[in-house]
Regions:
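Membrane-interface helix termini and inter-helical loops of multi-pass transporters
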Residues: 30-42, 72-76, 104-116
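Juxtamembrane/interfacial segments flanking transmembrane helices
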Residues: 65-73, 103-111, 137-153, 214
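Alpha-helical transmembrane segments of multi-pass membrane proteins
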Residues: 14-34
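Alpha-helical transmembrane segments
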Residues: 43-57, 118-137
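Hydrophobic transmembrane alpha-helices
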Residues: 19, 23-26, 46, 55, ...
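Alpha-helical transmembrane segments and their helix-start/interface "positive-inside/aromatic belt" motifs
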Residues: 2-14, 85
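Core segments of transmembrane alpha-helices
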Residues: 91-98, 103, 126-129, 172-185
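Juxtamembrane helix-capping/reentrant segments at transmembrane boundaries
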Residues: 39-47, 74-91, 156-160
Length: 257
């Protein structure tokens, strides 16, 4: 693939991702976008539930399988290595677009907060979650995570190197602040419907499973540095009572890399 074409492809894939990310905020929050998680049910409950579970499964399988090193080894025999990450980002975006398009509301209220202060607090926590997701990507390497660094290096004729293992700020408190952000974004709502609950439960289960695969790959890439980090820093819930020690331990791991 021509270097300029590869670079433009990476930019297009990133633009599709970012538009999808913004749509996801509206979809989960039931604001602005034409289709959202809590529309008016049009199908019987059982049929709608099966469709929603299938859509979530499509995303989970795509997102996890395409991220595994074994799949990448086979995939890069077809797709050039420098656009592999951009292609992964594109496929993930398409899986989410399919979910947004075909999602079937279930109806039914689990909880509803009518107090203005309570609603605003939950909206604030949801917004905090989305900001935490985005901030967490920039703390490590946003542009590598979404394929832009790879196509930029290819455009410049430079070899790609996997990013070094670092534990900046939030990563000294928990190993996966990005996933913490998603959990806040998915669960913090003043109007929890059956539809939203299914989405929140299933995505949380997926996050807990995905972490196991992701950390196995991180150990493969970073070896003892990540093993030590995993022993010393909690996965999702910070040790608030021993925050100082956790920060010092993570800093020690970072210095040893």
């Amino acid at each position: 693939m021509h270097r300029i074409a590869a670079f433009l492809y990476g930019i297009v894939c990133y633009a599709i991702f970012f538009a999808t990310f913004l749509y996801a905020i509206g979809f989960i929050g039931n604001v602005i976008v034409p289709t959202s998680i809590d529309g008016i049910p049009t199908l019987p409950f059982g049929q709608a539930l099966l469709i929603d579970l299938a859509l979530l499964a499509v995303f989970a399988v795509q997102h996890s399988v395409m991220a595994r090193p074994g799949f990448k080894t086979l995939w890069t025999k077809i797709v050039p290595e420098h656009v592999e990450r951009s292609t992964y980002v594109l496929f993930s975006s398409l899986a989410l677009i399919l979910l947004f398009w075909q999602w079937q509301p279930l109806g039914g209220a689990i909880w509803q907060i009518n107090n203005t202060l309570g609603r605003n607090v939950l909206y604030g926590l949801c917004a905090f979650g989305w900001l935490l997701v985005l901030a967490s990507t920039f703390l490590i390497n946003h542009f590598d995570l979404f394929g832009l660094r790879q196509v930029w290096l290819y455009l410049r004729g430079r070899d790609y190197e996997h990013p070094h293992f670092v534990t900046p700020s939030l990563y000294k408190l928990v190993r996966h602040p990005l996933y913490v952000g998603f959990i806040f974004a998915f669960w913090a709502t003043p109007d929890m419907t059956a539809t939203h609950l299914v989405f929140a439960v299933m995505t949380t289960v997926y996050i807990l499973l995905a972490i196991q695969f992701e950390e196995r790959d991180l150990i493969h890439y970073h070896g003892d540095a990540y093993r030590n980090y995993k022993r010393q820093v909690p996965m999702l819930i910070p040790r608030l009572l021993s925050r100082k020690n956790s920060v010092q331990q993570a800093a020690a791991v970072n210095d040893s890399v």
